[in-house]
Amino acid sequence: MKVIFLSGLYPKAIEGLLSENCRNNYLQNAPNEFQWGIVDGLIQNKVSALILSCPFLGTYPLHFKLRRVPEYRASLSKEVQLVSIGYNAIMGLKPLSIERHIRKEIEACVTDDNEEYFIIAYSTISYMLAPIIKIKASHQNVHLATIVTDLVDNALLFKDNQKYPKRFFINREIETIKEQYSYIDKFILLSAAMTEKIPAAIGKNKVLEGIWHESDIQASHNLTDIKSDQKTILYAGTIQPFAGINDFVDAFAKTSNPSYRLIICGAGSSEAYIQQKAKEDSRIIFKGRQPHQYVIQLQRAATLVVNPRKPDEEITRYSFPSKTIEYLASGTPMIGYHLEGIPSEYYTHMFTPTDLSIEAMAQEIDHVLSLPTHILKEKGEKAQAPIQSEKNSKAQVGKILRFLQE
């Protein structure tokens, strides 16, 4: 068996270069960590694999400074090779360039008619799946499994995507992706309910929930915002109303303990709202976008981490927030609402408010932060243990590999 992992990860050797050439110096940290978790799992399971990456970047000249994304090749282990394709980043030409290079690299790999090839695609982007579908048509020994982390319909939740003409192109992309589902042999989902929106996945899916990728975090950042005489809550994620951060900030503002601090990392349409609240309440610290390593350090040093998303939108039934695994693995206790996409067993390790009101969240903040330090430490450690032992890269990728061979 040979595995080809089609991804959008950033090779570590050129990650700095890619970040520097993004107009906003912003790389997609959460998807990158998930994908490197898959790669490390393939390495640990000693699988013969090609990691084929088309780094997730914006187009030139609006979002990326270079006309062409540089190629990079490396050997990650005896069995695993990495090819990060170089492609044309110019707006309008990018999809065709990526599609052509994907097809070229995969066709060069699937040369043995007696070998079974399993392509695991992290993305459902249509121009990344299109060349695989064409290759499958002429190679009976090539099989396609797709990791679905989010439903394509969710793209329209972001305000920037709701404007014309972007909305038109996104709707067309959604239609194309749904047509491509019929060509996918197996689906790897983060929530069992996703099959309600992807009927093609019924009877041929594996629910993964998430993956804990043990990052090599160096204590390279001075955490001056976290002090031993203060109780710090951390939120790191998208700064959008649907994420619940606006309401959580309002709930925090209703608390009065001067030793409380709320650190917020991220970017999005609610930044102006958060910045205004930070002016009104000096306990709120808005950091904006931050490097992933810095965020991980903050998670481990904070008193409490929070996912403030509420179950008042359909998306929460069909998703498993990536931060859940990362937060619970940090050893820091977590507070959040009951979301349908998260199995009930996770909530034994979390604090949850009594209802969805801002007042209830404010009361829960006071309740949790009033608990003795040893109770909070015990809560965090009990949550951490099963994540690190059962959701680590080797275990989760092992499940995927067994599923592919069923």
Q: What are these model-derived regions, one by one?
A:
Residues 158, 199, 206, 211-230, ...:
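Acidic anion/phosphate-binding donor-loop and adjacent secondary structure
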Residues 1-68, 250-253:
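N-terminal subdomain of nucleotide-sugar transferases
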Residues 272-297, 304:
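Nucleotide-activated donor-binding/catalytic signature segment of Leloir-type glycosyltransferases, i.e.
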Residues 4-6, 212, 225-243, 249-252, ...:
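Conserved donor-binding/catalytic core segment of Leloir-type glycosyltransferases
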Residues 348-359, 367-373:
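Conserved acidic donor-binding segment of nucleotide-sugar-dependent glycosyltransferases
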Residues 55, 62-64, 170-205, 212-214, ...:
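A short, active-site helix/loop in glycosyltransferases that binds the activated sugar's phosphate group
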Residues 36-38, 134-138, 152-154, 164-187:
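Membrane-proximal helix-turn-helix segments that form the acceptor-binding/catalytic region
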Residues 243, 293-295, 305-326, 335-346:
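Nucleotide-sugar-dependent
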